[in-house]
Swiss-Prot record:
GO terms for molecular function: host cell surface receptor binding; sialate 4-O-acetylesterase activity; sialate 9-O-acetylesterase activity. It comes from Murine coronavirus (strain JHM) (MHV-JHM). The active site is at S45 (nucleophile), D342 (charge relay system), H345 (charge relay system). Its EC number is 3.1.1.53. This is Hemagglutinin-esterase. N-glycosylated in the host RER. Residues 133-281 are annotated as: Receptor binding. The keyword Hydrolase applies. It comes from the Viruses.
Length: 439
């Protein structure tokens, strides 16, 4: 029986390797997944299990998320919202979550379809740029931190003027940053204004620093009727570091000279005491911040494309923001096409993509998720976890051309296997000879 096992093992091994090479075994899968149970997802209605409706549709039919994950405790999602929307506007949801492997499937609820402009003759493209810069900062930082939440930023302003809401469009009202009105004892906006704010309780904070990107005209209370160039900065009073920028474009807020809107940069600031300074026009300062806590070993985030069905206008800003090495982007090639709920919810292909959250995988890489850690035809780029070695399969040749590292590893394993086989053969031959001699 021992000789039979020795004879079958090499054939079985060759058969398994042959099947892997011929049929593309362990190819990267276009899914989002995780290496273990230490993961978390931030989403919108497509992963919001708490959404309630009374339109007669089947329960949870709006989800792209598998309903089995609804009670996992690993989802922070809100119908009609997004991280960007909550960060800047009064329409707020307190996104909160923690994990080693972070997944984002949101962003579509602030898109060209909404057409937000800060001013009547503003520019929605400015806000698409803001969106891209915001998510780039969030993705970069969440590759380094476990925990994300929102916090309010307290400030102290020594003047008499009150906060003002100057950025409104349809249902959206901007409240981050906060703008301080012009002091009544000044004739125009040519004066320096400042306020102090404190960041405490988190390892880092993401805050907005924004300016109007062109010529801002004074209000009706400004008898000079002048145009102003916005200038804003934040000064760290503990370290002496200054962050700031000025408006640079030749645009305004009139029908003949349109395009004036808010341009934001998203700073990652450490805890401390800060001073917000405006040299001209309105003082602005952060009212909310994203709180980053619990540094971790670097682990790229996974971002699922968040877009509408083609009947609505979408953008690709999350794709623009999702860059290597801190982010892996996942998408489908087909138009988003919802099922029983509406065309914007319950897409079959996106449900397949998110189904990877039901299981652990061995490796997560740029190309996708690898189920196993043995051999694949694709070398995992930027791989994390226990990743497979790769073989470059030459279908037009009778042999496979392996990458150097896998060849060395497989050669060592093959040598060890040969030694074991020779040892077993000699052992059984010697043992059989002894038994024949004794008989």
């Amino acid at each position: 029986m021992g000789s039979t096992c020795i004879a079958m093992a090499p054939r079985t091994l060759l058969l398994l390797i042959g099947c892997q090479l011929v049929f593309g075994f362990n190819e990267p899968l276009n899914i989002v997944s995780h290496l273990n149970d230490d993961w978390f997802l931030f989403g919108d209605s497509r992963s919001d299990c708490t959404y309630v409706e009374n339109n007669g549709h089947p329960k949870l039919d709006w989800l792209d998320l598998d309903p089995k994950l609804c009670n996992s405790g690993k989802i922070s999602a809100k119908s009609g919202n997004s991280l960007f929307r909550s960060f800047h506007f009064t329409d707020f949801y307190n996104y909160t979550g923690e994990g080693d492997q972070i997944v984002f499937y949101e962003g579509v609820n602030f898109s060209p379809n909404h057409g937000f402009k800060c001013l009547a003759y503003g520019d929605n493209k400015r806000w698409m740029g803001n969106k891209a810069r915001f998510y780039a900062r969030v993705y970069e930082k969440m590759a380094q931190y476990r925990s994300l939440s929102f916090v309010n930023v307290p400030y102290a302003y020594g003047g008499k003027a009150k906060p003002t809401s100057i950025c409104k469009h349809k249902t959206l009202t901007l409240n981050n940053p906060t703008f301080i009105s012009k002091e009544s004892n000044y004739v125009d906006y040519y004066y320096e204004s400042e306020a102090n704010f404190t960041l405490a309780g988190c390892d880092e904070f993401i805050v907005p620093l924004c300016v109007f990107n062109g010529h801002s005209k004074g209000s009706s209370s400004d008898p000079a009727n002048k145009y102003y160039m916005d200038s804003q900065s934040y000064y760290n009073m503990d370290t002496g570091v200054l962050y700031g920028f000025n408006s640079t474009l030749d645009v305004g807020n009139t029908a003949k000279d349109p395009g004036l809107d808010l341009t934001c940069r998203y700073l990652a600031l450490t805890p401390g005491n800060y001073k917000a300074v405006s040299l001209e026009y309105l003082l602005s300062l952060p009212s909310k911040a994203i709180c980053l806590r619990k540094p971790k070993r670097f682990m790229p985030v996974q971002v699922v494309d968040s877009r509408w069905n083609s009947t609505r206008q979408s953008d690709n800003m999350t794709a623009v923001a999702c860059q290597l090495p801190y982010c892996f982007f996942r998408n489908t090639s087909a138009d988003y096409s919802g099922g029983t709920h509406d065309v914007h919810h319950g897409d079959f292909h996106f449900r397949q993509l998110l189904s990877g959250l039901l299981l652990n995988v061995s490796c997560i890489a740029q190309q996708g998720a690898f189920l196993y850690n043995n051999v694949s035809s694709s070398w995992p780029a930027y791989g994390y976890g226990q990743c497979p070695t790769a073989a470059n399969i030459g279908y037009m040749a009778p042999v496979c051309i392996y990458d150097p590292l896998p060849v060395v590893l497989l050669g060592v394993l093959l040598g060890i296997a040969v030694l074991i086989i020779v040892f077993l053969i000699l052992y059984f031959m010697t043992d059989s000879g002894v038994r024949l001699h004794e008989a």
